[in-house]
Amino acid sequence: MNCQIRKRCGSCQYIDIDYSQQLIKKKQYCQQLFPKLHVHSVEGMENPYAYRNKVIVAFNQKYEYGLYEESSHHIVPMQKCLLHDEQTHQVLSKIQSLFKRYHMSIYDEQKKRGFLKHVLIRRAVETNQTLVVLVGTDSLFKGSKNFCQELVKACPHVQSIVLNINKRQTSIVLSQQEKVLYGKGFIVDKLCGLSFKISAQSFYQINHYQCEKLYAKVAELLKAQENQIVLDTYCGIGTIGMSIAKNVKQVIGVERNRDAYKDALNNAKMNHIDNISFYNEDATAFIQKLAQSSQHIDSIIMDPPRAGSTKEFIDAVGILKPQNVVYVSCDPSTQARDLKWFQQIGYQAKDVYLYDMFPHTEHVECVSVLHRKSLEK
């Protein structure tokens, strides 16, 4: 498929490469990073398009919407992005026409004036619900009632519309201040048979289809048993921990981001999962406290941010001595570094499993399970 803005956008580094070759390139990259491990072929998508369930666009003064040009804040207008689904395009098109009709004031970065900064759209794939977030510089949105009525009438799958008030002059899209204009301020999706609330701020995997495959692999590698205690670190809104909770005695989740932590609590309650608890703390500080208290942990799941984990976190794992550690990574280079640290405390990986969460980009998700060497003898 041909992308009309690929030379200016820069988001999809591999868009001109045949998809099968993209997967080969990603595997080869990981083989260089993990020369002593068995790097499995990348789990790709049957249809590697229209997979993004989260979209952020900006508008210019002509009411054209698009993505930012690479390494700039210049908007590249687009009619369609190959990674966005048809309903997302439908919503954006209707928003565009409403902005024109209501003469929406678009924020001008150079002049530091105007109202509308961004539009964020989140889609719940399984439940067919859409959340629209308008990012503006003020809590007053004149004509918001009519705007919401017309948008929902044209796009009935829009279940909620939120105004995020961001007065900061930075590149950060969302602020903590929100005002619900329509609906409940969130949507609900289903993942791995469970329900999850998705708000503007929620961490939620962008690729729903590949996410379920990834989590199934995590459960397979964990080999959890009903008498085990599992520590789920960097747990986000609790998706991985809740997906394996039914197979174990207890899950302990830890997440530093307060919004994600609150979502995790609500999600556990919504799914009636009573053997999982969450703590709003830094993963390294939390696991160090567990190590000092001699807490028994059978298995650890870790899904750190792109920067990877910390040496202090891994040293604490060495004190806790779990049977295994399942490491999910969105950056193979930092995972490769961390696996070397794990070796120093007696944990060894044999395999790396790859998942193409972002087709047409250079990114690849990696999963490994580490076992204590002494247990393998």
Label each region the model flagged:
Residues 149-153, 157-377:
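Rossmann-like S-adenosyl-L-methionine
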Residues 105-183:
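N-terminal auxiliary segments of SAM/dcSAM-dependent transferases
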Residues 13-108, 121, 125-127, 140-141:
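Extended interfacial segments that mediate partner engagement and assembly in macromolecular machines
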Residues 19, 137, 141, 203-204, ...:
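Short strand->helix junction
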Residues 12, 55, 119, 161, ...:
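A residue-level signal for conserved active-site and pocket-lining positions in enzyme catalytic cores
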Residues 66-70, 133-135, 264:
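Short, acidic/hydrophobic/Gly-rich beta-strand patch recurrent on exposed beta strands
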